[in-house]
């Protein structure tokens, strides 16, 4: 029983990587900078680790509120949102507050990485937002990958 579940997880992960090209036609024209296949995988892993440490804000309202409050981190935006007006203001807001942002091709992948069953349009990774003491170990786990991703995003 446990073995089947593991195999199911592995096939699910490989599916998301294989679907990168399949999801490209649905990406919005203003979705720039768009993550490459390799960076997309790295970003999703970082989101997954950050959500385990409870250091993510999900959804447009939460992300906009956090940006206006001046929190720092990384904004990950899904590039296949319809209608586009839902997220069109977020890149401008990020640039105003000098917060790095990146687009990824799929809202389904972003939702799955963010530990929700629903597709998610925007995720804001805010390191250190979890004030609990037990979150320290989990935070250290993803901090390194978070810093790597931020450097790559700023290079784009």
From Swiss-Prot:
UniProt-listed GO biological process terms: box H/ACA snoRNP assembly; rRNA processing; rRNA pseudouridine synthesis; snoRNA guided rRNA pseudouridine synthesis; snRNA pseudouridine synthesis
Domain of life: Eukaryota
Disulfide cross-links: none
The keyword rRNA processing is annotated on this UniProt entry: yes
KW Ribonucleoprotein (keyword) present: yes
An MF annotation (GO) of this entry: box H/ACA snoRNA binding
InterPro entries in the record: eL8/uL1-like, H/ACA_rnp_Nhp2-like, Ribosomal_eL30-like_sf, Ribosomal_eL8-like_CS, Ribosomal_eL8/eL30/eS12/Gad45, Ribosomal_eL8/Nhp2
Cellular compartment(s): Nucleus, Nucleolus
Gene Ontology, cellular component aspect: box H/ACA snoRNP complex; nucleolus; sno(s)RNA-containing ribonucleoprotein complex
Keywords for the protein's UniProt record, in alphabetical order: Nucleus, Ribonucleoprotein, Ribosome biogenesis, RNA-binding, rRNA processing
Purpose: Non-catalytic component of the H/ACA small nucleolar ribonucleoprotein (H/ACA snoRNP), which catalyzes pseudouridylation of rRNA and is required for ribosome biogenesis. This involves the isomerization of uridine such that the ribose is subsequently attached to C5, instead of the normal N1. Pseudouridine ('psi') residues may serve to stabilize the conformation of rRNAs. The H/ACA snoRNP complex also mediates pseudouridylation of other types of RNAs. The H/ACA snoRNP complex mediates pseudouridylation at position 93 in U2 snRNA. Essential for growth. Directly binds H/ACA snoRNAs.
Protein family according to the UniProt entry: Belongs to the eukaryotic ribosomal protein eL8 family.
Subunit structure: Component of the small nucleolar ribonucleoprotein particles containing H/ACA-type snoRNAs (H/ACA snoRNPs). The protein component of the H/ACA snoRNP contains CBF5, GAR1, NHP2 and NOP10. The complex contains a stable core composed of CBF5 and NOP10, to which GAR1 and NHP2 subsequently bind. Interacts with SHQ1. Interacts with NAF1.
Name this protein carries in UniProt: H/ACA ribonucleoprotein complex subunit NHP2
Organism in which the protein naturally occurs: Saccharomyces cerevisiae (strain ATCC 204508 / S288c) (Baker's yeast)
Lineage: Eukaryota, Fungi, Dikarya, Ascomycota, Saccharomycotina
């Amino acid at each position: 029983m446990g073995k089947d579940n593991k195999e199911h997880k592995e096939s699910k992960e490989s599916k998301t990587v294989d679907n990168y090209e399949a999801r490209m036609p649905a990406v919005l024209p203003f979705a720039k900078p768009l993550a490459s296949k390799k960076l997309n995988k790295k970003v999703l892993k970082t989101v997954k680790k950050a959500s385990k440490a409870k250091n993510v804000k999900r959804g447009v309202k939460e992300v906009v509120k956090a940006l206006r409050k001046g929190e720092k981190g990384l904004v990950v935006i899904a590039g296949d949102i319809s209608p586009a007006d839902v997220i069109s203001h977020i890149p401008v807001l990020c640039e105003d507050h000098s917060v790095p942002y990146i687009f990824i091709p799929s809202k389904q992948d972003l939702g799955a990485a963010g530990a929700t069953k629903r597709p998610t349009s925007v995720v804001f990774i805010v390191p250190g937002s979890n004030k609990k003491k037990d979150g320290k170990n989990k935070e250290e786990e993803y901090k390194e990958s978070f810093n790597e991703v931020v450097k790559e995003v700023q290079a784009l």
